[in-house]
Amino acid sequence: MTKRAEAKYKIDRRMGQNIWGRPKSPVNRREYGPGQHGQRRKGKLSDFGTQLKAKQKLKGYYGNISEKQFRKYYAEAIRLRGDSGDNLIGLLERRLDAVIYRAKFVPTVFAARQFVNHGHVKVNGKRVNIASYLVKVGDVIEVKESSREILIVLEAKQLAERDVPDYYEVDHNKMTAKITRIPLPADVPYPVLMEPNLVIEFYSR
């Protein structure tokens, strides 16, 4: 197993949940966290502990976003009009690596980040190599023609584990995607329960 895969599955084990719904997740075989103390019985979490876990799970799901960057999403979420939890999910789903993952151009969100960073993606005809780039409604996201035969892309085309959400328009022949609206948390096909309002509460303490 690669170091990247090990880190990914360590997140699953720490959360005690298969947060991406992957068949090879270690929590499909055991229900304790990583490390020598992982098998200890866990007591009931405090409010702080519950909020912290919700934050770690959401950060982990989107590729273990850095704390500094995640806090910026919180600040923007509370600045925008409407429900802050809804706003937080909307921002995360607009990340370019999240769009590439949702469109099924690559098999994992970790692969999506690397794919974007390596310059394989265009937005409105221009190359963008920043995974955290926020896509707008109507933007056209495209896999570069020279990158469409990369093995990881070919493998992703065979995926049957997840469907493309209805807030995207995706053409897998042309390898293009477009976000048609900003999703609400209930629209996002998370394999496990995400609680963005607990994340907002965590940072609002």
UniProtKB/Swiss-Prot annotation:
GO terms for biological process: ribosomal small subunit biogenesis; translation. GO terms for cellular component: small ribosomal subunit. SUPFAM superfamilies: Alpha-L RNA-binding motif (SSF55174). CDD domains: S4. Keywords: Ribonucleoprotein, Ribosomal protein, RNA-binding, rRNA-binding. The keyword Cytoplasm does not apply. Residues 18-46 are annotated as: Disordered. Residues 94-157 form the S4 RNA-binding domain. Pfam families: Ribosomal_S4, S4. It comes from the Bacteria. One of its GO terms (molecular function) is rRNA binding. InterPro entries: Ribosomal_uS4, Ribosomal_uS4_bac-type, Ribosomal_uS4_CS, Ribosomal_uS4_N, S4_RNA-bd, S4_RNA-bd_sf. PANTHER family: 30S 40S RIBOSOMAL PROTEIN, SMALL RIBOSOMAL SUBUNIT PROTEIN US4M. Part of the 30S ribosomal subunit. Contacts protein S5. The interaction surface between S4 and S5 is involved in control of translational fidelity. One of the primary rRNA binding proteins, it binds directly to 16S rRNA where it nucleates assembly of the body of the 30S subunit. Belongs to the universal ribosomal protein uS4 family. NCBIfam families: PRK05327.1, rpsD_bact. This is Small ribosomal subunit protein uS4. It comes from Methylocella silvestris (strain DSM 15510 / CIP 108128 / LMG 27833 / NCIMB 13906 / BL2).
